[in-house]
């Protein structure tokens, strides 16, 4: 608590928050950089060690427990090791999976007044559409029911308020313009490395921006045990910017004097560490160990750590206003000050109802009108920026308070993030889980390297007294290496001591021949240990070899899928927290866009999912009237559907359930709801085409049946006419024969018919007429039956067509 005693008092009227008061707040923050005051965050050194480990740099002090578990001071303990980043591949697997996960969101209006207005607009529009359908008498009952069902589906699933439509299109536009998925992917890497994921939303040049915050460069104060960065009462961001970036960001608030200071800043550390009286400021060189962490032991007293190696590769000092690369130190402070507001009770002059409104502290209460007042002290987000040691800009209340209409005290700084901790404790990140195994792997691999270097194989013992006279060792090694001959001279006389003048071969100096230095078994043991360490790391992290794509030949497809699925369950908690951070960050970005667009119209080309563009214009004042929230669908079913989309699309293409163009759009669309609408629309079009084809087929069949009926009727008519002509011919012949004389052509005389013959002829004619009448009746019956059969067929075809359309 003593560290905050020097912080200026915040419960002051706005008139007393002078420029000097604001500078004092920033100067207090200038003394607190690099320190860790959060109860749920790891120290900066701990995070720096993790980041360096992923970048291939080892902190040997962090390996002491592995290299020297007994704490023995010995020269054989190595002071440097070669690092083998076996954990990086597992982190990259998760990073790749994050980039492919579905994050399907939809912007909705959340404030109650706007929701009521949306309900009224939806109701009025629905009633208008229903009235138009009722008054339209040209449609049948079946068509009316179909349109009513479509209308119900539209207003249930697809209808959106115009503000929600604009918010969705605006957010999708900025997501593509800023490549926000890549920003989130980098933040997910921070979460796996140090257990923190933080983003900042702000307004730069009149445009809303979102950036990832480096966990090494942010200090959080007074956040309690909350794992949300938004709950902090004070945040310090410390970074080194190039002079060009400083001017780009603050050009509208920098004076010519400030620009001159930036152009003439010092360019070496000694110039800043010594003041005008040649006094050395020791704060620039060392930091109190108690404020850092327990990762590095104290040496030479309390002050030990040189922060010059924290930010970059030894060219920056976190307490200097510049670094050796020509960059300026930019210190940004965000804190919650106190503001007095008045809650005034008044009465509507027309209805007499009570009304409550909030006013600033300088509001004059009109007691004659019956106004009553209550005063409250609420939180107000402030900001300030210190550039170098002399430039102070933007010391003011935040332009964006990120508060809600129902709570004027709720606010934050536009810095959104989460600590991946458990039960109010400090985070234990994925890198922290795997780091001991990677250290052990490096130590064992160092032994393996030394064992391989010392594995000389079989060594020949050489007695120099037997080397032939006049030969040196190099010549002898040449014959042994090239000719594989070990030459000895047993008659060479000794030259030293008691052996002088004696033959070397007569001495009892027979060598042992070969010395075996082969340590292959030891090397194999080290290799087995390395494989064991990899397996243990995979089990602890929950990232199996199958998930990394390392599959042996004996594994089955089902076994690999099961192993991958179980592995994904272990790491799902990381993605759950990450999706929540993404949701809050996008909501914060929308709030930032509201203030950035207020007072002007935003006209932009909205980039659709298929890379086509659409011009959209948004009224900033109307857009800022509502509060917005995100509805996210990232359930397991959604993720599984995304994974199976390839198989389903291929099956749909083979069965011609979907068109090829629709399948290509499915892969370019990022919204699951849009994919469902594309599939439903294409299925509807295919059904309509199939129904139209069936209708045309039925019409063709009906035409063929009609033509066949006409042909059959023509044949019957022709047959009837032929029968009539034949009968008439027979009657005429009979009449001629009955009335005519003898046939003289053939010279045969035929007597006249007798009465009996005439009677027989008349009887035959009568029988023929009756038979002709029966044939006519039968022909009429056949014709009527054919018409009935054709009518039945037409009705059956119509019934089949209507059933297919339904």
Swiss-Prot record:
Chain segments carrying region Disordered: 783-806
A single cellular component GO annotation: viral capsid
Chain spans, region Interaction with Cargo protein 1: 337-380
Bias (Basic and acidic residues): 783-792
Source organism, top-level taxon: Viruses
Localization terms from the record: Virion
UniProt key word Cell inner membrane: no
Residue stretches of biased makeup (Basic residues): 795-806
Primary subcellular site in the record, as a coarse category: virion
Keywords: Capsid protein, Viral capsid assembly, Viral genome packaging, Viral release from host cell, Virion
Stated role: Forms the portal vertex of the capsid. Probably involved in head assembly, genome packaging, tail attachment, and genome ejection.
Subunit structure: Homododecamer. Interacts with the Cargo protein 1. Interacts with the major capsid protein.
Record's protein name: Portal protein
Native organism: Bacteroides phage crAss001 (Bacteroides phage PhiCrAss001)
């Amino acid at each position: 608590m003593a560290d905050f005693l020097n912080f200026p008092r915040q419960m002051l009227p706005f008139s007393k928050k002078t420029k000097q008061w604001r500078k004092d707040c920033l100067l207090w923050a200038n003394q607190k950089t690099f320190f860790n005051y959060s109860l749920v965050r790891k120290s900066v050194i701990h995070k720096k060690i993790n980041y360096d480990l992923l970048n291939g740099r080892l902190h040997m002090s962090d390996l002491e427990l592995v290299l020297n578990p007994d704490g023995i001071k010995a020269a054989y303990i190595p002071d440097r090791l070669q690092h083998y980043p076996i954990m990086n591949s597992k982190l990259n697997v998760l990073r790749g999976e994050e980039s492919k996960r579905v994050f399907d969101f939809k912007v909705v209006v959340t404030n109650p007044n706007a929701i009521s207005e949306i309900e009224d607009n939806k109701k009025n529009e629905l009633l208008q559409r229903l009235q138009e359908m009722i008054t339209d008498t040209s449609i049948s009952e079946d068509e009316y029911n179909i349109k009513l069902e479509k209308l119900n589906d539209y207003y249930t699933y697809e209808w959106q308020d115009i503000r929600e439509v604009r918010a969705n299109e605006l957010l999708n536009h900025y997501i593509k313009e800023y490549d926000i998925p890549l920003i989130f992917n980098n933040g997910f890497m921070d979460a796996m490395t140090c257990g923190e994921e933080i983003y900042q939303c702000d307004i730069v040049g009149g445009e809303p921006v979102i950036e990832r915050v480096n966990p090494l460069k942010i200090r959080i104060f007074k956040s309690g045990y909350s794992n949300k960065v938004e709950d902090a009462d004070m945040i310090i961001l410390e970074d080194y910017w190039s002079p060009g970036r400083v001017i780009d960001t603050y050009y509208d608030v920098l004076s010519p004097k400030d620009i001159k200071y930036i152009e003439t800043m010092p360019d070496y550390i000694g110039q800043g560490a010594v003041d005008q009286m040649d006094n050395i400021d020791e704060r620039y060189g060392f930091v109190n160990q108690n404020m850092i962490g327990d990762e590095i032991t104290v040496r030479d007293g309390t002050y030990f750590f040189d922060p010059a190696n924290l930010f970059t590769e030894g060219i920056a000092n976190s307490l200097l206003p510049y670094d050796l690369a020509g960059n300026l130190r930019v210190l940004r402070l965000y804190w919650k000050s106190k503001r007095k507001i008045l809650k005034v009770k008044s009465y509507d002059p027309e209805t007499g109802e009570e009304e409550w409104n909030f006013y600033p502290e300088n509001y004059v209460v009109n007691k004659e009108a019956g106004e009553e007042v209550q005063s409250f002290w609420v939180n107000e987000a402030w900001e300030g920026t210190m550039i170098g040691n002399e430039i102070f800009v933007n010391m003011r209340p935040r332009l964006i308070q990120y508060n809600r209409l129902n709570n004027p005290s709720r606010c934050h700084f536009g810095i959104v993030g989460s600590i991946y901790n458990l039960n109010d404790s400090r985070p234990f990140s994925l890198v922290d889980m795997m780091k001991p195994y990677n250290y052990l792997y490096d130590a064992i691999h160092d032994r393996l390297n030394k064992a391989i270097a010392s594995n000389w194989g079989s060594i020949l013992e050489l007695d120099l007294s037997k080397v032939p006279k006049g030969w040196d060792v190099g010549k002898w090694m040449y014959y042994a290496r090239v000719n594989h001959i070990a030459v000895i001279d047993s008659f060479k006389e000794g030259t030293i001591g008691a052996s002088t003048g004696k033959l070397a071969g007569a001495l009892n100096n027979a060598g042992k021949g070969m010395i075996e230095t082969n340590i292959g078994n030891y090397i194999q043991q080290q290799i087995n240990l390395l494989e064991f360490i990899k397996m243990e790391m995979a089990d602890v992290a929950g990232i199996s070899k199958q998930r990394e794509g390392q599959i042996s030949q004996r594994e089955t497809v089902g076994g690999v899928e099961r192993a991958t699925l179980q592995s994904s369950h272990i790491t799902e908690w990381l993605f759950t927290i990450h999706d929540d951070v993404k949701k809050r960050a996008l909501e914060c970005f929308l709030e930032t866009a509201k203030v950035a667009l207020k007072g002007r119209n935003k006209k932009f080309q909205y980039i659709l999912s298929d890379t086509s563009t659409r011009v959209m214009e948004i009224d900033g004042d109307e857009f800022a009237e509502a509060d917005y929230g995100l509805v996210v669908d990232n359930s397991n079913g959604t993720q599984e559907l995304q994974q199976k989309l390839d198989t389903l699309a291929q099956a749909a293409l083979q069965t011609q359930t979907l068109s090829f163009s629709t399948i290509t759009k499915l892969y370019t669309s990022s919204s699951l709801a849009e994919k469902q609408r594309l599939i439903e629309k294409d299925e509807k079009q295919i059904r309509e085409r199939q129904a139209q084809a069936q209708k045309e087929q039925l019409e063709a069949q009906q035409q063929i049946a009609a033509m066949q009926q006409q042909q059959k009727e023509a044949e019957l008519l022709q047959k009837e006419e032929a029968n009539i002509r034949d009968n008439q011919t027979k009657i005429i012949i009979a009449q001629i024969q009955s009335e005519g004389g003898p046939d003289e052509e053939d010279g045969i005389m035929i007597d006249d018919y007798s009465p009996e013959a005439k009677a027989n002829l008349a009887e035959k004619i009568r029988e023929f007429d009756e038979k002709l009448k029966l044939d006519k009746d039968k022909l009429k019956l056949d014709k009527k039956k054919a018409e009935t059969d054709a009518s039945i067929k037409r009705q059956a075809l119509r019934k089949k067509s209507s059933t297919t359309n339904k």
